Amino acid sequence: MSVNQKFEKTGSIAYLCDEYLKNNFIDPEASERLGVKRGLRNPDGTGVLAGLTNVCDVVGYDLVDGKRVPTDGKLIYRGIDVEQIVRAAYAEDRFVFEEVIWLLLFGSLPTPHQLASFKQVLEAHRELPKDFAEDMIMKAPSPNIMNKMARSVLALYSYDDNPEEQSLTNILSQSIALIASLPTIMVNAYQIKRRVYDRQSMYLHLPQPGQSTAEHILSTYRADQKFTKEEAKLLDLCLVLHADHGGGNNSTFACRVLSSSGTDTYSAISAAIGSLKGPKHGGANHKVMEMLGYIMEGVKDHSDDTEIAAFLRRILRKEAGDGSGLIYGMGHAVYTKSDPRAVILRRNAEHLAVEKGFEDEFRVLCAVERLGPDAVREVKGTKDVCANVDLFSGLIYRMLGISEDLFTPLFAISRIPGWCAHRVEEVVFANRIMRPAYKYLGHEQEYIPLEERG
């Protein structure tokens, strides 16, 4: 019996909702009046400084005389511009996500010997514990892969003979094992979801030796286990660009908050997955693909900038699209002139888009990137808006034949190295539980004995 069915049997939830709304209200204007930093953001849009980190920096503006000045965006992993990492990967024709994992965790670039050894360690941890897939995934499937991934991470606590210890040795061991095994959990959860909820055939492939993380995902996801190197490199690029985004993004901050309490690695990473599952954080590329469908249908000439710009203005006026008034894939809390991840994805995805028959869709998204800022300025009066990484990532996954069920889970696979790096840093160096304040606004009332209540 579902939760809703139980309420239908025992009493109406609508009555309880009415009771809540009758007795609870917070005036939105009270936050400004009392100096509350809603969303932990300052009035100028900058984030409230909540901690220190060596892991990652996100640069989207300069502060000049206390004011934000737009600048081209940069994403910095341990002091290295991600643009440099990506250019090296393509120049040397190799996969670099594993190198980025090392860089984020340890703060240095691995030597060839260190990288080769580290890849072997990751490969050794890809296979799940004995009977784990059967007991923890098959017997309790979920229609939502993020939900199943979070539950599976928590379940791995029971397979660890020392889950609670907070030593650097233990946390790093747990982190590396989770980074390696989470892609296998994701694909297993998806295949079983296909079988149980979609009534389609499932394919459970074992990890193959000598593969990068991107190759491992494609070979276990696809029925025939076949893929091209160009496909795997584009997925590797997506993993690299999503690997971290500073300590203040919602899921990483959630991981750091839990880590500050002294809880175990499995609880902290599961909480981060739960945060990323939220549509305000990790689900935007779904909405971009939905919006792209509206544009492809509503615009007659997909090469006509004037027609596309007019349609974007209609979206902003809530006359087209899903009625939200939002151009999905546009705007970011930090980036102002450009999101380097979007720039890099656009630059490297075009060839495969043409090859896979998605040239029209790709060019429409490029037009949205180009025309969107002016449309937002004209309709909303908002300045400093640029395309973000979500504008192109969803189409890339579709080009790779990846189900939308896995769009956000792939984000989690990408981001877990960052989560783990921030967890280690929080435990080793911060060593103080996070405990911000909340202002009480409730009114006083007298306790009334039960028999006297009307």
Predicted segments with their positions:
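Non-transmembrane, aqueous-exposed alpha-helical and coiled segments at domain scale
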Residues: M1-G454
